[in-house]
Amino acid sequence: VSSTARGRGDVYKSLTKAALAQALLLLRTALELGYSEGCLNSKSFQSHQKELESFPELISILLNEKSGFMRNLARITSSVQNWIFLGCGIYYPVAMESALKMKEVTYLHAEGMPAGFLKHGTLSMIEESVHSLFFVPPPAEVDLHNRTIIAIEEIKTRGGTLVGLYFEGDSQAKSLLDHAVELPPVPFLIAPFVQMILAQMFAYYTALDLKRNIDKPRNLAKSVTVG
């Protein structure tokens, strides 16, 4: 959130903490259920717990190391009027949340879509002026990674502009993307959350570049009171 939100209390209308907190709570619940039902053994459960406990420190490091890269990416692309955010599997809701934040604070057109469904109409939108932002899973998540790379190649073949967040060691994604930010290796469990936070940062810096009122986006209320 912006300095206004930090300095004067929670006045920010487009909350980044809500989606992240809900997703992490759901993950913690799933881990507890998995352990209690015998789907996870004690060793796996404790390992995942340690990964989650390391998350705040990891995010602090990433924010310090990658904020400059995200700011630079925002400056390069802030004139883009149309965005498609794409991810496979668990990265699809990450794409949805990230597209929502982009449209809320920048007033640009942004849609979150599943990367595996491009041929169901989405490809007709592809042209150089439409930028596609991909959330690329770690290469070790073989199935999700392969499906994401196929989608990237389909858009590249049709002349679309490709932006992406990918993890260190992914030479395949690096060679295909026009603009990209490389992330350090992280546990599979928290990889989607890392990308979500950086995408929220990308929306923030894009809004700053466009001189939007980030704390109070136009036409938005703190809570929705009507159906």
Label the predicted regions:
Residues 2-3, 13-227:
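A SIS-like phosphosugar-recognition module
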Residues 6-9:
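A short, hydrophobic C-terminal helix/tail in secreted or cell-surface proteins
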